[in-house]
């Protein structure tokens, strides 16, 4: 009888140890997943930074422009009273702004870096960088609205911007 009781107690102890080990494994697995997610986020941020640096190198007239645009975008998002952005939304705006000029990749260097005034035809090509940028960035899950930032970043509140000449109203 006592042997059976000891066996039951031992089995209960082993089962409890198994449960503890499983809980530890789940915690470790959860920590590993979180670490992988953070690593992926860092990789995406590094990729965005590298691409924006490449853009700045291609366009000699706008060195560091992407970084400044991102900093200004973040500052505006933080201080825009009409819409209180979450920290995550501000981070997305910041990262997206780094790539607002990615469409310039498709602009010929002769047009992009021309020291003289652009002809009407060249200016038309240059203006297309917004649409091309939107096409390049469309569908990026980690920057869901970057394509819109690329397309509309030359629009103006008075409707005199491009590519569509729409009015941008910041107040309701």
Q: Residue locations for each model-derived region?
A:
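Alpha-helical transmembrane segments of integral membrane proteins
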Residues: 2-3, 92
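Metal-dependent catalytic cores of enzymes that make or break cyclic nucleotides
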Residues: 45-172
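General structural signal for secondary-structure boundaries
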Residues: 1, 11-12, 83-87
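Juxtamembrane or sensor-core-proximal signal-transducing alpha helices
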Residues: 3-36
């Amino acid at each position: 009888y006592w042997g059976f009781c000891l066996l039951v107690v031992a089995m209960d102890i082993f089962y409890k140890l198994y449960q503890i080990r499983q809980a530890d494994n789940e915690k470790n697995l959860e920590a590993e997943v979180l670490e992988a997610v953070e690593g992926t986020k860092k990789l995406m941020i590094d990729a965005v930074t590298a691409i924006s640096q490449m853009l700045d190198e291609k366009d000699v007239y706008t060195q560091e422009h992407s970084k400044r645009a991102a900093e200004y975008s973040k500052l505006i998002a933080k201080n825009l009273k009409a819409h209180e952005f979450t920290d995550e939304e501000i981070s997305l705006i910041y990262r997206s702004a780094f790539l607002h000029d990615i469409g310039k990749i498709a602009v010929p260097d002769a047009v992009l870096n021309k020291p003289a005034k652009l002809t009407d035809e060249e200016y038309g090509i240059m203006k297309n960088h917004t649409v091309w940028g939107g096409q390049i960035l469309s569908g990026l899950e980690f920057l869901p609205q970057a394509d819109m930032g690329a397309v509309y970043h030359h629009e103006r509140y008075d409707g005199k911007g491009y590519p569509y000449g729409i009015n941008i109203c910041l107040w309701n």
